[in-house]
Amino acid sequence: MIKLLRSYCLYFAWLVSCIGTLMSVYYSYLLNVEPCVLCYYQRICLFPLVVILGISAYLDDLSVKIYALPLALIGFCIAIYQVCLQEIPGMTLDICGKVSCSTKLFLLGFITMPMASALAFFAIANLLIFATKSE
């Protein structure tokens, strides 16, 4: 059973990246929530993963780990930094533009956007680590 699940890890990672991308676009363009600078950096890491993981899942190509894992880990680090900006009093970032990077916007009423982003990048990274070829 575990072997079967591990063979679908690339598909699950692709699904997580698709959901993250759709949520990002939904909040930006349909709800008109302006993203901060760190959100743009996280998008730079997330958006290519949709294409990269989609193609690699279709081709069952595990060499994608070389390209996708660094993107997921960099995105995770940026998201965790933004969570720290929001949660630790006194932390500031000078490059924030009109929208402050420490502004809290809750998804579904209980989780902040950067925390959801960090969880998504963490899930993608772990799914890539545990992925095996389909049989």
Swiss-Prot record:
Chief localization: membrane
MF terms in GO: protein-disulfide reductase activity
A single BP term in Gene Ontology: protein folding
Taxonomic superkingdom: Bacteria
Disulphide bond pairs: 36-39, 96-101
Keyword line: Cell inner membrane, Cell membrane, Chaperone, Disulfide bond, Electron transport, Membrane, Oxidoreductase, Redox-active center, Transmembrane, Transmembrane helix, Transport
Residue spans crossing the bilayer: 7-26, 41-60, 67-84, 109-131
Signal peptide per UniProt: none
Membrane topology reported for the UniProt record: Multi-pass membrane protein
Keyword Cell division: no
One Gene Ontology cellular component: plasma membrane
Compartments, record wording: Cell inner membrane
Protein family per UniProt: Belongs to the DsbB family. BdbC subfamily.
Reported function: Required for disulfide bond formation in some proteins.
HAMAP family: BdbC (MF_00287)
Matches recorded under NCBIfam families: PRK00611.1
Protein name in the entry: Probable disulfide formation protein
Organism of derivation: Chlamydia muridarum (strain MoPn / Nigg)
